[in-house]
From Swiss-Prot:
PANTHER family: GLUTAMYL-TRNA(GLN) AMIDOTRANSFERASE SUBUNIT A, TRANSAMIDASE. This is Glutamyl-tRNA(Gln) amidotransferase subunit A. The gene is gatA. GO terms for molecular function: ATP binding; glutaminyl-tRNA synthase (glutamine-hydrolyzing) activity. Keywords: ATP-binding, Ligase, Nucleotide-binding, Protein biosynthesis. It catalyses: L-glutamyl-tRNA(Gln) + L-glutamine + ATP + H2O = L-glutaminyl-tRNA(Gln) + L-glutamate + ADP + phosphate + H(+). Gene3D superfamilies: Amidase signature (AS) domain. One of its GO terms (cellular component) is glutamyl-tRNA(Gln) amidotransferase complex. The active site is at residues 75, 150, 174. Heterotrimer of A, B and C subunits. Belongs to the amidase family. GatA subfamily. Allows the formation of correctly charged Gln-tRNA(Gln) through the transamidation of misacylated Glu-tRNA(Gln) in organisms which lack glutaminyl-tRNA synthetase. The reaction takes place in the presence of glutamine and ATP through an activated gamma-phospho-Glu-tRNA(Gln). Its EC number is 6.3.5.7.
């Protein structure tokens, strides 16, 4: 049963092959058995089974929606009533929210059953899920490897079949990169598509929630429930509701002569295929592109000339916003408070020094510096100007193509601990995802192969980038690939 997709699980529930309670119990047992992966921060069988019983009651009416009774894991950056919501940090290790994040509420209202809160890099700052106060997450494909970050717990949970789907967030690649490293499908929607209300903030102009699952079809079904305007989020977009599944299985053009993607133009940025791309990743991406050509698509070279500037731009803007957002965690209203202190100022200092981990402190310091008097114009304002140019470069490219494709990361997953002492090397791993986030565009990762040699068990993801509000078409393109290949069906050994 754990090998079934969301659609297949829903069919099993409808046919009474199993109940929502039995399904929840199955995944709870799997989570317990795979505890060594450290994919979950919190599991509460009582809360999970109570939701499952309510879902069964709804299923018995015969009028349940497509997600009723299906299990989901939530990244622990979404506040969830009744559960601890930690953001992977000591600062919030005992925090319980009095309300649900909009994403959590919408999926719960759709009837989904929460099986637990997944591990993550502290406050979503990281590319390896090694920055969590609750310990690193292991990659189910190779337990010596990182699962990617910051949504590494969600990616590992879906890859190891501990949940059929999970929520994630993407600030600079935190859905796409762990999806690539863990061999699953994940999509970052257009900025503003999914409400940030109740999502513990890292960088407010970049943060975006999205689904992580086995397939593009499952992600489309989840996005139907997650997306939509929310008046409680000032950055939420006012758009007509969409059915993100509407193009699945449909040809790109009606007169495609039997080829499902005839007429599709795929842009290949020359900057994504330079010397820094590992040979085994390049081989998998090239094979995927050949498959797209077989499906009828045409490959077009495009240019994104400011790609290399996305790293310095991101690591000015994101830390600046983080230093502001995280200033609220002072040990007064909520969060960790130092046990001993001399006065109020000493309490602030000690509480924040004890509550935040090294990477979070590093980014707060960088952010405070670039926002300080005398440096704001030289760093923050300049970065915002280049950000606008990066977005314009994408629009120029989209005049020549319908979607853009390339690698998600320059390499497959690296070994746990391999880059912990060199944060710059960790930052460079986001070279292909940061510009998409800076532009606010939708992007996704689709499994397309594996590494070579010692990395032969480590997955490779193909990145698909669409223009604003083009998620339904992106999902169509990804789904066509998955109908023709079986990379997304492969599972780690022993799963």
């Amino acid at each position: 049963m754990h090998e079934k997709s969301l659609t297949e699980l829903r069919a099993a529930l409808t046919a009474r092959e199993c109940s929502a309670v039995e399904l929840a119990q199955l995944y709870l047992k799997r989570i317990e058995a795979a505890n060594s992966l450290n994919a979950f921060i919190q599991v509460d069988p009582d809360l999970t089974l109570a939701q499952a019983k309510a879902a069964d009651a709804l299923l018995h009416t015969g009028h349940a929606g497509p997600l009723v009774g299906l299990p989901i894991a939530h990244k622990d950056v979404f506040v969830t009533k009744g559960w601890r919501s930690t953001a992977g940090s000591k600062m919030l290790s005992n925090y319980e929210s009095p309300f649900d994040a909009t994403v959590v509420a919408r999926l719960q209202n759709a009837g989904m059953v929460c099986v637990g809160k997944t591990n993550m890099d502290e406050f979503a700052m990281g590319s390896s899920n090694e920055n969590s106060y609750f310990g690193p997450v292991q990659n189910p494909w190779d337990v010596k490897a990182v699962p990617g970050g910051s949504s590494g717990g969600s990616a590992a949970a879906v890859a190891a079949r501990l949940a059929p789907a999970a929520t994630g967030t993407d600030t600079g690649g935190s859905i796409r990169q762990p999806a690539s490293f863990s061999g699953i499908t994940g999509i970052k929607p257009t900025y503003g598509r999914v409400s940030r209300y109740g999502m513990i903030a890292f960088a407010s102009s970049l943060d975006q929630g999205g689904p992580m699952a086995r397939s593009a079809a499952d992600c489309a079904t989840l996005l139907n429930a997650m997306a939509g305007f929310d008046g409680r989020d000032s950055t939420s977009l006012v758009r007509d509701d969409e059915d993100y599944t509407r193009y699945l299985g449909q040809p790109w053009k009606e007169d495609g002569a039997g080829k499902p993607l005839a007429g599709l133009r795929i842009g290949l940025p020359k900057e994504y295929f330079g010397a820094g791309l590992a040979d085994d990743v390049r081989a998998s991406i090239d094979a995927a592109l050949k498959q797209y050509e077989a499906l009828g698509a045409t490959l077009v070279e495009v240019s994104l000339p400011k790609t290399e500037l996305s790293i310095p731009v991101y690591y000015v803007i994101a830390p600046a916003e983080a230093s502001s957002n995280l200033s609220r965690f002072d040990g007064v209203r909520f969060g960790h408070r130092a046990a001993e202190y001399r006065d109020l100022l000493d309490m602030y200092k000690k509480s924040r020094a004890e509550g935040f981990g090294p990477e979070v402190k590093r980014r707060i310091l960088v952010g405070a510096y670039v926002l300080s008097h005398g440096y704001y114009d030289a760093y923050y304002l300049q970065a915002q100007k280049i950000r606008r140019i990066i977005a314009q470069d994408f629009q120029e490219a989209f005049r020549q193509c319908d979607v853009i494709m390339g690698p998600v990361a320059p390499t497959v997953a690296w070994d746990l601990g391999a880059k912990g002492d060199d944060p710059v090397q960790m930052y460079l791993a986001d070279i292909y995802t940061l510009s998409v986030s800076l532009a606010g565009l939708p992007g996704m990762s689709v499994p397309c192969g594996f590494g070579a040699g010692a990395n032969a068990q480590r997955p490779v993801g193909l990145q698909i980038i669409g223009n604003y509000f083009n998620e339904a078409r992106m999902l169509q393109v990804a789904d066509a690939f998955q109908r023709a290949t079986d990379w997304h069906r492969k599972a780690p050994a022993g799963v």
